[in-house]
Design a protein with these regions (language model features):
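C-terminal catalytic and target-recognition region of SAM-dependent MTase-like enzymes
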Residues: 178, 322-332, 338-339, 355, ...
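Accessory RNA-recognition modules of RNA-modification enzymes
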Residues: 1-347, 352-360, 366
Length: 420
């Protein structure tokens, strides 16, 4: 392919073929792949190329929908849609709602397509999941679920999200994906001159905290309830974005563990453990004497985990990068100084996945059961390839739509070690 080719600015008529990872869609023109946003499979569109670095593909934005899919709906959020003048210019709207032009049921089918293709292409697994909604989301049309929001501020002091593919701020008066408590703050009524970023967090116990340029405006920790337990989170600490996510995820992990069984005396692990959500939920479900270590690299989150798990005598929280901790444990196993053969290990890594090093260390540790909680299907499939080749098999896989109207999807996989 000619590396010097450049279609930037050209207008192309394209038939959209399928969805791709990252919330974009695939078309082809003159032997090249064209990645197009804000469209649907089967649609015929006119699109303008906004990025072309040569090679086998370029990126485009639709400027006219010639033949629309029956799954297309008016975007629920005017500032994020591409209707009207923005479409004619090929300019995206506010980020964070890139699937807002698609019926909810079809969004989930597209997310299942992405998971299915990633598993097949990268892990050699033929499996199509059903992407399940969080209870209540269908009734709310997938709106009003975000409990964590980040807004940026433009030169005029008006807050809003970034425009897609840019650092231009789109001023907004309402955030349809956010819970009511966020919108009740009416942040748009205040001038935020000289401020760069506003972050808002709402707990399911009714607290509303926000920070301005990383400086908290309230004292104390946020208090969340999940899996029948109380969790305290320091300002800026991680908690699931969807108001129902923590309960859905802990319930699913606990169910997967129950099917396989858990040895309460084994050296069980909760890797990338955050504030202790999965460790606490497992201990509460299976026995308060469950032995489990939660491992987290962020010091403040580890301190929160110690507080949250203080009533569980056999649970400990360790502050360490999972990569270092896993390497140390793998070395101990290789030296005959540790035994994880009866253990259950929960991993909930960031978007990049656990990576080849941790996969290798897990294979050396050889726990009986691994439960992998993933927010990126491609990273998950890459890691599964190594785990499956190393002697594990998929016992169960479930997927959840924790981010309606976006391309993001959560997948949980139960892996058991093959009998030797």
């Amino acid at each position: 392919m000619d590396k010097t080719i450049n279609w930037t600015g050209q207008r192309l008529t394209l038939r959209i073929e399928k969805v791709a990872h990252g919330g974009i869609f695939v078309a082809r023109h003159e032997g090249r792949v064209v990645f197009v946003s804000h469209v649907l499979p089967g649609e015929l569109v006119k699109a303008v190329v906004f990025e072309d670095r040569g090679g086998s593909f370029c990126r485009a934005e639709p400027i006219e929908i010639i033949e629309a899919s029956e799954d297309r709906v008016p975007h629920f959020w005017k500032e994020a849609g591409t209707d009207g003048p923005q479409r004619a210019l090929g300019v995206g709207g506010a980020g964070g709602a890139e699937f807002g032009h698609i019926k909810l049921e079809r969004q989930r089918q597209l997310k299942a397509d992405v998971i299915e293709e990633a598993l097949q292409r990268m892990a050699g697994v033929e499996l199509r999941p059903v992407v399940e909604p969080v209870p209540g989301d269908d009734e709310a049309n997938g709106l009003g679920y975000r409990t964590r929001v980040q807004l940026h501020v433009d030169e005029a002091g008006e807050p809003g999200p970034y425009r897609e593919r840019s650092h231009d701020v789109v001023p907004v008066k309402h955030l349809p994906l956010a819970v009511d408590e966020v919108n009740d703050l009416a942040l748009h009524l205040k001038n935020w001159q000289d401020v760069k970023k506003i972050e808002v967090a709402v707990s399911n116990t009714g607290q509303v905290h926000y920070s301005v340029d990383k400086k908290p405006k309230q004292e104390g920790k946020l208090v969340e309830r999940a899996a029948g337990r109380t969790f305290r989170i320091s300002s800026g600490g991680f908690w699931q974005v969807h108001k129902g996510a923590a309960d859905v995820l802990t319930k699913t992990v606990n169910e997967m563990v129950a099917v396989v069984g858990i040895d309460v005396d084994a050296p069980n692990l909760d890797l990338y453990g955050g504030v202790g959500l999965f460790a606490g939920a497992l201990a509460a479900k299976f026995a308060n004497r469950l032995r489990i270590t939660t491992v987290e690299s962020v010091k403040q989150a580890t301190e929160d985990a110690k507080l949250n798990l203080a009533d569980l005598p056999a649970v400990r929280a360790v502050c360490a990068p999972t990569e270092r901790f896993a390497a140390e444990q793998a070395s101990a196993v290789a030296a005959g100084e540790a035994d994880y053969s009866r253990a259950t290990v929960v991993v909930d890594p960031p978007r990049a996945g656990v990576g080849a090093r941790v996969v290798g260390d897990l294979l050396t540790m050889a726990p009986l059961h691994i439960v992998y909680v993933a927010c990126d299907p491609v990273a998950l499939a890459r890691d599964l390839k190594g785990l499956l080749a190393g002697g594990y098999q998929i016992k169960a896989l479930k997927a959840f739509d924790l981010f309606p109207h976006t391309h993001h999807v959560e997948t949980i996989v139960s892996l058991v070690r093959n009998s030797k």
